[in-house]
Each structure stands twice: as structure tokens, then as C-alpha cells.
Amino acid sequence: MGQTVTTPLSLTLEHWGDVQRIASNQSVEVKKRRRVTFCPAEWPTFDVGWPQDGTFNLDIILQVKSKVFSPGPHGHPDQVPYIVTWEAIAYEPPSWVKPFVSPKLSLSPTAPILPSGPSTQPPPRSALYPALTPSIKPRPSKPQVLSDNGGPLIDLLTEDPPPYGEQGPSSPDGDGDREEATYTSEIPAPSPMVSRLRGKRDPPAADSTTSRAFPLRLGGNGQLQYWPFSSSDLYNWKNNNPSFSEDPGKLTALIESVLTTHQPTWDDCQQLLGTLLTGEEKQRVLLEARKAVRGNDGRPTQLPNEVNSAFPLERPDWDYTTPEGRNHLVLYRQLLLAGLQNAGRSPTNLAKVKGITQGPNESPSAFLERLKEAYRRYTPYDPEDHGQETSVSMSFIWQSAPDIGRKLERLEDLKSKTLRDLVREAEKIFNKRETPEEREERFRRETEENEERRRAEDEQREKERDRRRQREMSKLLATVVTGQRQDRQGGERKRPQLDKDQCAYCKEKGHWAKDCPKKPRGPRGPRPQTSLLTLDD
């Protein structure tokens, strides 16, 4: 009652400050809300075994990382900072994570020295795992392999087997020796699948450049044993990666990983190249690899004997059980990798580099990786070279997304900024972008504001139109009323008033109208008589 279960997700959320510090060391920035979304909702859908509460298992983390870094529409660039941070926590766990991480197993030497003489110690009975040994009836005289003290059982397929007990004293009649021989002869030989499982489980040693997951391994009899590649491995590598012509960088990285982890022989390398490359691509790679052979002076050589000795085209007689043979194989793999890198370079084409632009939802870190890959593929320059940092930085600024590029150009003291500083600033700008929900909400709000403003403007224009009509109608009515008043005043016009000494007839002053000399003086004519009609008329 009252107890809570601690999970990797809840543990990282409780120590979120440390998580942000680890993310900052990886030149990325993470947000708690997105981490809570990706871990339980997004990553379990990748079908790689990711639990909803998270895990610190590096195998599962690397599988999720491969899904996140997938090219094209299948990738998830917005999740890159979060899976990179999670990987860093699992790879170098802080103190609060160590109790929840399974302890790393001690690794055996990758290139063991073969025994030169008879050993005084009794050889181990088998190099197999207990799960693969046949069921043998235990003998009371022999100590048990697993203790009965109630301790936790190991994973029989993925963990190293426990040490066998010391050999008891042999019986005088030699029966014990015969039983020992029978016990050893009944154990089957190691299988390739067991080596693959153990190779995937055990990480490489920090101070070694080789891995335990190679086809050459030390068997139970003290001899190196060889298992070739499985057909399923070759099939998956070919179908889950682009061709060499389409993306030489990615396929080169895959082959480099295989050469490092599996330590293949000369025949394995030919099988690998024949599966992943076309005939023309393979010939080009072999030619470039032979060009990379160096002589005793450290410079490239064209002497046929030295070239054929270091990188033969026909099957050599290298014995991988001897140090000399293993050294030949190491040099051959290094030259093969150099040939892949040189053959993957295309003719110089800066237009291809300028055509690499940041996608709308692509993180700056993923965009920088694509930009560097374009430099490696289409130019003779190494983007990791310090002398090319300025060119890569300028391309990163100019070819970033418009909103990120504008803000990067306005940074203070831009000339002193390193490429890492620019990526850090770009990540901050990228993470401050709106989420799709916030962007939709902003668009909806802006649409409503525009509609409201448009309605207000329409109402204002309508009111202005009404006022203009009213003014025009007022002017028209005023004109009509004024005209009517003038007409009415014109019909009732009175005679002008006369002065006291002014004539009403001639309008001259000094006399009146009866004395006006201009007025005619003749007798008046008789007035016409008005006749009245009677009823008889």
C-alpha cells in the first residue's frame, strides 16, 4: 500500500535536470512533454520490443535509434535528440541509473594466444552453454554447476556459462577417465546461432578495436573455430539498406560495422561484397582498395608484388589461427574499407551540396549529417577537417529552414561561432517551434480575428455609405425647398414702393401720375356694355 513502481521513464523524469545536462553534452535539447509522448506512445509502435515504461537495454535502444534515423519518410527526425540522450544515459549510466542497469560481462581476449605446449591445468570440458548440452544424469561424486543457495539463475542463451568445478581425483582403476572421455565426446560442437547470440549480447571492450562477435572464436579444444555468415544476415543486410550507387555512405557504414564486429576472413569478405554490391561496383571498390596499398616508405605503391601481398585478388593461404594470418586479414579489411570510401565518392559537384536543404520537420542535427554526407560524396573535402569548418558552417546557415537561417544570420559575433555553437542555437530555435496543435490553434484564432476585422470594416463602410446618402439627400431636399420658396415669392411679387414726389407712371420724380406729361390725355372710350341673356334667348 502506498508504494510506487520505479520505471526507466519515471526515473528519468525524476532526474530531469541531469537528463537535460546529458542532452546538452550531446549538443541537443529535450523537452519533458515530448519525452513523455515518445517513450510510451511512439517507440512501442516500432515493433522492436520497446516497453511503454522504457528500458536501458542497449540492444533495444539501438534498434529504436535505427528506426528514428531511417532515411526518407520512414524516419523520425524530431525524435533524434531524445533517443540519442537515452542512448547516452544507458551507455554511460549516472549513479541513479546504475542500480537499474544489468552489469556488463567481462570480455575474454579477442585474439587469444594459442597454447604452445601441454598445459599443466586440465582443459575445460566444453565451451558450450549449459542450455545446449545434452541431458546427462548427474553423478553424486561431481560438484554441481549451479548452486542451490537460491541465487538468481543466469540467462542460458545470452550469458556466459558458470565455471565448472575442479576435477576430482581419478579412480585407481581408470573408470573416471573413461567417464570423462564419454562425457566430453557427447557434447555437440558449437553452433553458429549461439555465436551470433553471444556476439549481439556482449559489447566490445573499451580498450579494444575488435569484437567478440566474429566468426573466429576460441573453441573448447583451444583452437580457433570458424562459422561463416548466415544467409539470413546477408538477406537482411541487402534488403534493409540502399544500394551502393544510391547511398554509398550508408552501405559503407554497414560494411565497416560488419568488418569490425564479425572479423570476417578473405572468403567472407568476397561473399559480403558479392551480396551487397553489383559486379561493376565490386570491381571499382577492389581497384580503389589496391590503389590504397602503401609501401615500406608509407606512400602509395604500385609494385605488383606488394599490392598482391597486401590485397590479393585470388584466395590467399592466410592461416587465421596464426598471428601472421590475422595481421594479414586486419590489413586486408582496412584496405577494403578505404576502397569503399574512395569508390563512393562522386565527381565534384557543388550544386548537389547546395541542393541539400533542411526539411520542414527535420532537426538541425539530422540536417547537418545529410550536409556532411553530401560534402563527402560530391566534393573531395572532408567536412570533419578543421579547415573546412567555415564552409560547412556557411552552408549550414544558408541552407537551413528560412526561420532558422534568418535567426542564425542575426547572431552576435557570428564569425567566432563554431559549427557546434551554430547547431546548438539551431536546436534551440527548432525546439521553440509551434507544435501542430499550437499552429492549428493559432491559424484558427487568426482566422476568427480576420473575420471579425472584416465584418467591422464592412459595417464601417456601410455606415459611411449611409451617412453619404443622408448628406446627399439633405442637399437635395434643401435645393428643392429653396426653389419652391423662390417660386412662391415670385408669384406674389408686390409693386415697388414710390417716393413721395415720384410718378407712378413714368417713375420720374417731381410730379405725380395725374400730372405726368407722358400720360396720354385723350377722352376715354365708352366702356362696352354687357348684355344679359334671358331665358327666352
From Swiss-Prot:
Query: Can you list the GO cellular component terms from the UniProt entry?
Result: host cell plasma membrane; host multivesicular body; membrane; viral nucleocapsid
Spell out where lipidation (N-myristoyl glycine) occurs. Answer: 2
The annotated region (Interaction with host UBE2I) lies at 429-434
Asked if the record carries the keyword Acetylation, the reply is: no
The organism's superkingdom is given as Viruses
Q: Where is this motif: LYPX(n)L motif?
A: 128-132
**Where are the CCHC-type Zn fingers located?**
501-518
| Chain location of the short sequence motif PTAP/PSAP motif per the record | 109-112
* Coiled-coil ranges per UniProt: 437-477
Question: InterPro entries of this UniProt entry?
Answer: G_retro_matrix (IPR000840), G_retro_matrix_sf (IPR036946), Gag_p12 (IPR002079), Gag_P30 (IPR003036), Retrov_capsid_N (IPR008919), Retroviral_Gag-Pol_poly (IPR050462), Retrovr_matrix (IPR010999), Znf_CCHC (IPR001878)
User: Looking at the record, which segments are called Disordered?
Assistant: 112-217, 433-537
One GO BP annotation here?
A: viral budding via host ESCRT complex
Q: Which residues carry this modification: Phosphoserine?
A: 191
Q: Where is this site: Cleavage?
A: 129-130, 214-215, 477-478
Q: Please outline how this chain is modified post-translation.
A: RNA-binding phosphoprotein p12 is phosphorylated on serine residues.
Query: Do the record's keywords include Electron transport?
Result: no
Q: Where is the composition biased (Basic and acidic residues)?
A: 433-474, 485-518
**Location of the region described as Interaction with host PIAS4 in the Swiss-Prot/TrEMBL record:** 344-392
Which residue ranges does the UniProt annotation give for the motif PPXY motif?
161-164
Recorded GO molecular functions are: RNA binding; structural constituent of virion; zinc ion binding
Protein name (database record): Gag polyprotein
Which species does the entry assign this protein to? Radiation murine leukemia virus
Name of the gene: gag
